[in-house]
């Protein structure tokens, strides 16, 4: 009886080891899947990197060698151009990806010393001011960016110009802005965002089309990625 039992015992142990060998590797991907599932929309350092914390302040200036433009038409080149501009946002929600992160845009500035105009009769640019802040900004996993003003208001911008007849203010409004976030350069780009003139002299063009690329978007010194 003992002689016949030993082989069965060895067979049982061998079968148990085989089952364990097949079972243990399957548990490893489960851990990896959980880690991927916990990745938020915004991270720093790399895709799937360190989560951006709620309350973190993100900033970005114009991409190197580019300018923010405010042209009279989507296909034209007449208008205002600035080589120095910056925005600042505070992160208010950063859910698990895929999803949509929410930010509060607290500042969007243009350095008037970097701005020029090629509009006939305009001698220079006194400044560009963004009104009705703060705006709500959303960034989705697919790269879609939407900038929305407070309820009942608009994205409002005043372009102050020096002319042959003195200083004039051209005031423009848009219901919202849409852009695209890219991990290539950690950028946010706005292309031909249409504004409508609500006040200003005849030297102010009827519509303004805003184009700019901001990069890199950073959290402190770390580049921000969209997941």
Regions inferred by a protein language model and the residue ranges of each:
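Extracytosolic low-complexity repeat regions of secreted or lipid-anchored proteins
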Residues: 161-167, 173-203
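Predominantly extracellular/secreted and cell-surface proteins with exposed
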Residues: 79-178
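Generic recognition of long tandem-repeat/solenoid scaffolds
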Residues: 53-54, 59-63, 144-158, 186-192
């Amino acid at each position: 009886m003992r002689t016949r039992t030993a082989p069965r015992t060895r067979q049982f142990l061998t079968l148990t080891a085989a089952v364990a060998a097949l079972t243990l590797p399957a548990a490893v991907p489960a851990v990896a899947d959980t880690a991927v599932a916990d990745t938020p929309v915004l991270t720093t350092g790399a895709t799937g990197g360190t989560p951006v914390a709620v309350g973190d302040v993100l900033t970005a200036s114009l991409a190197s060698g580019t300018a923010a433009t405010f042209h009279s038409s989507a296909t034209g080149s007449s208008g205002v151009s600035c080589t120095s501009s910056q925005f600042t946002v505070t992160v208010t929600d950063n859910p698990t990806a895929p999803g949509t992160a929410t930010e509060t845009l607290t500042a969007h500035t243009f350095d008037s010393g970097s701005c020029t105009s090629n509009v006939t009769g305009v001698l220079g640019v006194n400044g560009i001011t963004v009104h009705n802040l703060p705006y709500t900004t959303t960034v989705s996993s697919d790269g879609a960016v939407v900038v929305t003003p407070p309820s009942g208001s608009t994205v409002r911008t005043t372009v102050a110009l020096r002319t042959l007849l003195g200083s004039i203010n051209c005031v423009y409004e848009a219901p919202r802005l849409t852009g695209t976030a890219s991990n290539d350069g950690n950028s946010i780009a706005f292309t031909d965002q249409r504004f409508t003139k609500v006040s200003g002299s005849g030297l102010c063009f009827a519509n303004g089309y805003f184009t700019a690329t901001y990069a890199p978007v950073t959290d402190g010194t770390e580049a921000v990625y969209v997941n």
